[in-house]
Amino acid sequence: MEDSFAPDNVRSRLLFSGLKELETHGVSDFSLRRVAQDAGVSCAAPYRHFKDKDELIGAVIGFVIEGWTLLSEQISGIFSSDSRSLVIELAVAGLRFWIANGNFRTVISASQTLDKAPLSAFEKPITDAAKRYMSDNGASYSDTLSFKLLSMIYGAVILVDGGYESAERAAESLRCVLSSEL
């Protein structure tokens, strides 16, 4: 069944299927058999790429974090000379990333039982931008700004999930609030 696919392609399909499995069934009911079936490979295929389900879950978490890292690095490069815009755009991108990747929340929740690294990887670019913004404006950094930024992002995600706000309106509202506050 999987012979027509390159090994890297099979691994990628297993990661995508693992992400869907986490979103649908969570960590406690995670099934390598369902992942293999969804990826269109044999039940033995996951074991050729991952030692066990924990290793696959860890790889899925790494895959999601890598997506955010690439996005945040691109934004940091674009707004490298304007720390205010950098804070705003990273916060809006973070919100859009969480909304567009509902499975990211599942992965983060799942990973909290493993370690805090995935959540830290999401928060670090935003916190670093807040530190730089404070420094550029002659203020000493306190974690209050980061707390406010992250609270607004997480709160907006909850509002969108609850149907109180559309994703686009939440992103624009966040941008508007940050533009007036910074």
Each language-model region and where it sits:
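Amphipathic alpha-helical packing segments from all-alpha helical-bundle domains
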Residues: 66, 85, 89, 109-147, ...
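Short hydrophobic/aromatic patch on the recognition helix
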Residues: 39-50
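Amphipathic C-terminal alpha-helical segment
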Residues: 100, 150-168, 179-182
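Amphipathic alpha-helical segments used for helix-helix packing
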Residues: 95-117, 158-159, 163
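Basic, helix-initiating cap at the start of DNA-binding domains
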Residues: 1-25, 32-38, 55
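Hydrophobic alpha-helical connector segments
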Residues: 59, 73-103, 149
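Amphipathic alpha-helical segments enriched in hydrophobic/aromatic and basic residues
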Residues: 22, 31-32, 42, 53-64, ...
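Solvent-exposed, amphipathic alpha-helical segments
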Residues: 17-25, 67-78, 152-159
